[in-house]
Amino acid sequence: MEGSDNTNTHCWICKDEYNVSTNFCNCKNEFKIVHKNCLEEWINFSHNTKCKICNGKYNIKKNKKSCLRWKCSFMYCNVPAICVSLICLLLLPLTILLVKFNLKSMLENIENRDLIALISAMAYSLPCVVGFITVVHILIALYDYYLAAKSDNTTYQVYEYI
């Protein structure tokens, strides 16, 4: 290192020279020297609003984009689970129709009316239960996707302590 003083004048993130003394947390010595842009990128990547060295909380402001300006990514999406759920939803009406026609012809031969009512109720309710569970699963997957996208579309702006 050139120069006569022993102080480290390099940003601890990008290692470029930095001559301005800013105070974003309680760190001393070389960890105190950091570019504002480098620190903001670091915080936006890690989503950690506290310094890992001194545990001091950064003076930050959250900037949330409006939902219409979000950048969405399929990397948060559980694609196999959503595909299985959509296939179940597509097969649901077909299953109900098959149950209806096959059950009707099968039950015409049975004389006990109470047994017929019980079998009918079970046969019709099972596809409905599967459909309900599938819809709930899709809603949960969409909510998880929303939370991940919301987190990814929030940026932090750091300010110096005064």
From Swiss-Prot:
Binding residue positions for Zn(2+) 1: C11, C14, H35, C38
InterPro entries referenced in this protein's UniProt entry, alphabetically: Znf_RING-CH, Znf_RING/FYVE/PHD
Record membrane topology: Multi-pass membrane protein
Pfam families in the cross-refs: RINGv (PF12906)
Gene Ontology, cellular component aspect: host cell endosome; host cell Golgi apparatus; host cell membrane; membrane
Disulfide bonds: none
Catalysis performed (reactions): S-ubiquitinyl-[E2 ubiquitin-conjugating enzyme]-L-cysteine + [acceptor protein]-L-lysine = [E2 ubiquitin-conjugating enzyme]-L-cysteine + N(6)-ubiquitinyl-[acceptor protein]-L-lysine
EC number: 2.3.2.27
Keyword annotations of the record: Host endosome, Host Golgi apparatus, Host membrane, Host-virus interaction, Inhibition of host adaptive immune response by virus, Inhibition of host MHC class I molecule presentation by virus, Membrane, Metal-binding, Modulation of host ubiquitin pathway by viral E3 ligase, Modulation of host ubiquitin pathway by virus, Transferase, Transmembrane, Transmembrane helix, Ubl conjugation pathway, Viral immunoevasion, Zinc, Zinc-finger
Superkingdom to which the source organism belongs: Viruses
Record-level GO BP terms: symbiont-mediated perturbation of host ubiquitin-like protein modification; symbiont-mediated suppression of host antigen processing and presentation of peptide antigen via MHC class I
Location of the protein in the cell: Host membrane; Host Golgi apparatus, Host trans-Golgi network membrane; Host early endosome membrane
Zinc finger (RING-CH-type): 3-61
Segments on the Cytoplasmic face: 1-78, 143-162
Family label: Belongs to the poxviridae LAP protein family.
Domain notes: The RING-CH-type zinc finger domain is required for E3 ligase activity.
Record's function text: E3 ubiquitin-protein ligase which promotes ubiquitination and subsequent degradation of host MHC-I and CD4 molecules, presumably to prevent lysis of infected cells by cytotoxic T-lymphocytes and NK cell. Binds target molecules through transmembrane interaction. The result of this ubiquitination is the enhancement of the endocytosis of the target chain and the delivery to the lysosome, where it is proteolytically destroyed.
Protein name listed in UniProt: E3 ubiquitin-protein ligase LAP
Native species: Lumpy skin disease virus
Lineage of origin: Viruses, Varidnaviria, Bamfordvirae, Nucleocytoviricota, Pokkesviricetes
